Amino acid sequence: DTARRQSEEARFYLGMLARLLISAVIEGDRRVTAGFEQDVRFPQDRTPEELRILWETLSDRVDRKLGELPHRTEVEKARREISDRCRAFAEKPGGVYRLNVPTGAGKTLSSLRYALAHAALHGKSRILFVAPILAIIDQNSKVIRQYIGDDSLILEHHSNAVQTGLSQNELDERELLVQSWDAPIIIT
């Protein structure tokens, strides 16, 4: 009985290993094909130096746009202070942190500043924005896209993410990115 159970367990694990290897081969084939045919570049294809430059460039872009915002009222000054503290907090090691501030306090841009600076300082290959409610994802996505200024760097992956007006190559590239979450900034 023990020998039979061990044999079944061994077959199960061998089956799982075979599935893993087949998945890796298929994923590798898709990447090579996409890279060759469509000139798709994945985040892990970027060198650490290229990623650092990307994050620093985006961080500078966001800082520049934020610098253009007025900060005359007390609310505007408070938003700026929260944002600056989040940016400074990026030097801390990675972890799970909470940002508890009231509605309208600038959480999206404050967390974006933190994420970009943290990614640059700590060699991260991607940034994930995760929210439990689609309305929040949609709202944050619009703000992030506006400040990043390059939709090709952002992947939205949720049930409301519908792409219109894209060519077949762009749709194929997006599908590949969705399957692997290989975009520098992922919103889900």
Please state what every model-predicted region is.
Residues 92-99, 124-126, 182-184:
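Pre-Walker A (Motif I) flank of P-loop NTPase domains
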